[in-house]
From Swiss-Prot:
GO molecular function, one term: ATP hydrolysis activity
UniProt keyword RNA-binding present: no
Name the record gives this protein: DNA replication and repair protein RecF
GO cellular component annotations of the record: cytoplasm
Pfam families: SMC_N
UniProt cross-references to InterPro entries, sorted A to Z: AAA+_ATPase, DNA-binding_RecF, DNA-binding_RecF_CS, P-loop_NTPase, RecF/RecN/SMC_N, RecF_2
Stated role: The RecF protein is involved in DNA metabolism; it is required for DNA replication and normal SOS inducibility. RecF binds preferentially to single-stranded, linear DNA. It also seems to bind ATP.
Cell compartments where the protein resides: Cytoplasm
Stored Gene3D superfamilies: P-loop containing nucleotide triphosphate hydrolases, RecF/RecN/SMC, N-terminal domain
Length: 374
């Protein structure tokens, strides 16, 4: 069983609809129930900001600050983390105009948000993701990269560095500055970073596929078969140095075409995640809404198990409205799977009765009007 990473305290100040909120947690799962709009998802969002990035809503930090507050917000968490007990604080200060939040770990300013992955890994599933299989490829790419990031914390930095290099190349091409040596230097960087990104994605999908195949018969949820398309399809069994050479040549040969298009037309930023319902041999986008939700739940749970197996530490799960639209038997099976992962899960719903099958495996909180009652 993986080590259980769990929050013991969560304190919010001027966060969304909370002027101040404090939760004392005992390591069990946390179930948050209350009316729609009470602030359940806001609590989940606060926990999600204990990972790199902008959290489960990807909101601008100015939008997170409570309306009517002086400005700024803060999140404090104490947890039993991957390296022992740790305290994490993050937020922005009043009057601070920034796209980056401040972060302290045990009172010491962190150099980068990537340091958070030394202490916990977070995965989430929210209603906004229900249209993942039918929506834009950029949403699936973002989902894919969060899966990779849970196993390879350097992936996020590679992706942002690639985007930065690509923007530089696009600007040079847009300005008509076709300096061969300058472009070659940028394209070499893009090739190195881009292939590393693509290989990390491919490796994660391979690991997840093998795990899924091993647990086919025991899961109450349909299993997904996963493929990548849109960039160097079918070539990733070749040596990385050869792939980098090919992509570098591809970029050099497409300069005029990319200049005309106003963007880079080939690269890992064009990759799409193709998902099929394994048992039905059907593309996920063609499945019913209920089947798509079940596929997504199964995929996230399988990935959570993979993270626990490979890191030795169970991820914290944020599952918003997870029990809605599931019958009683499937809800009970879902809770057993979540508990069997060995980690702590935060779950929300409007009806406490939907979580009865959890019994004493969970702490129950009621959320109402920006207040939390334990």
């Amino acid at each position: 069983m993986p080590h259980k990473v769990s929050l013991s305290r969560l304190k919010l100040t001027d966060f969304r609809n909370y002027a101040a909120a404090s939760l004392s947690l005992d390591g069990r799962h946390a179930v948050l129930t209350g009316d729609n709009g009470a602030g359940k998802t806001n609590l989940m969002e606060a926990v999600s900001l204990l990972s790199p990035g902008r959290g489960l809503r990807r909101a601008a930090y100015g939008d997170i600050t409570r309306v009517g507050a002086a400005g700024g917000f803060s999140i404090f968490a104490a947890l039993d983390g991957m390296e022992g007990e740790v305290e994490i604080g993050t937020g922005i200060e009043a009057g601070e105009e920034t796209t980056a939040r401040r972060l302290r770990i045990n009172g010491t300013p962190a150099k980068t948000a990537d340091e958070l992955t030394d202490h916990l890994r977070l995965l989430w599933l929210i209603p906004a993701m229900d249209g993942l299989f039918t929506g834009a490829s950029s949403d699936r790419r973002r989902f894919l990269d969060r899966l990779v990031l849970s196993l390879d914390p350097a992936h996020g930095r590679r992706a942002s560095d690639f985007e930065r290099a690509m923007r530089s190349r696009n600007k040079l091409l847009d300005d008509g500055r076709f300096d061969p040596s300058w472009l070659a230097g940028i394209e070499e960087q893009m090739a190195s970073l881009g292939i590393a990104m693509a290989l990390a994605r491919q490796e994660m999908l391979g690991l997840l596929t093998r795990l899924t195949e091993e647990t086919l018969e025991s899961s109450p949820f349909p299993s997904a078969s996963l493929q990548l398309s849109g960039f160097m399809d079918g070539q990733f069994s070749r040596p990385s140095v050869d792939l980098e050479d090919d992509y570098r040549v591809m970029l050099a040969e497409s300069r005029y075409r990319d200049a005309g298009a106003g963007r880079t037309l080939e690269g890992p930023h064009r990759t799409d995640l193709v998902v099929h319902h394994r048992e039905k041999a059907m593309e996920a986008a063609r499945c019913s809404t209920g089947e798509q939700k079940a596929l997504l739940v199964g995929l996230v749970l399988a990935h959570a198990r993979l993270v626990g197996n490979l890191t030795g530490h169970a991820p914290i799960l944020l599952l918003d409205e997870i029990a809605a639209h599931l019958d009683e038997n499937r809800r009970a099976a879902l809770f057993d799977i979540i508990d069997g992962l060995g980690g702590q899960a935060f779950m929300t719903g409007t009806d406490r009765g939907m979580f009865t099958a959890l019994g004493d495996r969970a702490q129950f909180f009621t959320v109402a009007d920006g207040r939390v009652f334990g």
